[in-house]
Amino acid sequence: MTSRLFALIPCAGTGSRSGAPMPKQYRTVAGRDMLHYSLAAFDACSEFAQTLVVIAPDDQHFDARRFGGLRFAVQRCGGASRQASVLNGLHALAGFGAHDDDWVLVHDAARPGITPALIRALVGALKDDAVGGIMALPVADTLKRVAPGTDNRIDHTEPRDGLWQAQTPQMFRIGMLRDAILRAQSDGHDLTDEASAIEWSGHAPRLVQGSLRNFKVTYPEDFDLAEAILGRGAAG
């Protein structure tokens, strides 16, 4: 049986660092909710069986009418952490016919610069891979390590050779990712991305070149950059 493709977008976070009065995935960027751009990118990839959005059980901001015409499903099964939300989402995918050998692409709603071309590039690079992998960018900036207990004084410069900045989507087999997260949880680890769980299980995910436009909107000033990128795309 040919493995199918599913997308999972965890949206249960509060986005506290963004300085917004609401979760950042619902803030307006270039005329649309930030979440819209991720949903639209996966909707444009007809090869996906389903896109599942995981929101908090008490989410008062999500309104499906704001994403009319896009193909996706919603589950109010978000957990206390990203890892918990992703795990709950993986379990929920079974209700949409997903099997352990199917692929899931986990994507941050706070990366509205994702495009169908980037998604397809990731799938094309990994569809025959034994482990899976993630979208990422080689580190271009010089990295400084801060000395502990100082007022942000440099301790030393970190060599950047071989360092990559993780992005999303992160693409793994549903069963492998679920079991890896469960193993990390049982060992007391709350990991910040899916690749970390796979690594914890002893596997080596592959890195696939991403794009600067696929950056994560985190701080208040990031919204202006996202507005410029996405607004330019709409104008074109």
Curated annotation (Swiss-Prot):
Site entry (Transition state stabilizer), positions: R17, K24
Alphabetical keyword list: Isoprene biosynthesis, Nucleotidyltransferase, Transferase
BP GO annotations: isopentenyl diphosphate biosynthetic process, methylerythritol 4-phosphate pathway
Feature type site, description Positions MEP for the nucleophilic attack: R160, K216
Enzyme Commission number(s) from the entry: 2.7.7.60
Reaction equations catalysed: 2-C-methyl-D-erythritol 4-phosphate + CTP + H(+) = 4-CDP-2-C-methyl-D-erythritol + diphosphate
GO molecular function, one term: 2-C-methyl-D-erythritol 4-phosphate cytidylyltransferase activity
Pfam families in the cross-refs: IspD (PF01128)
Gene3D superfamilies recorded: Spore Coat Polysaccharide Biosynthesis Protein SpsA, Chain A
Listed pathway(s): Isoprenoid biosynthesis; isopentenyl diphosphate biosynthesis via DXP pathway; isopentenyl diphosphate from 1-deoxy-D-xylulose 5-phosphate: step 2/6
Lineage: superkingdom: Bacteria
Function summary: Catalyzes the formation of 4-diphosphocytidyl-2-C-methyl-D-erythritol from CTP and 2-C-methyl-D-erythritol 4-phosphate (MEP).
Family per record: Belongs to the IspD/TarI cytidylyltransferase family. IspD subfamily.
Name of this chain's protein: 2-C-methyl-D-erythritol 4-phosphate cytidylyltransferase
Record organism: Paraburkholderia phymatum (strain DSM 17167 / CIP 108236 / LMG 21445 / STM815) (Burkholderia phymatum)
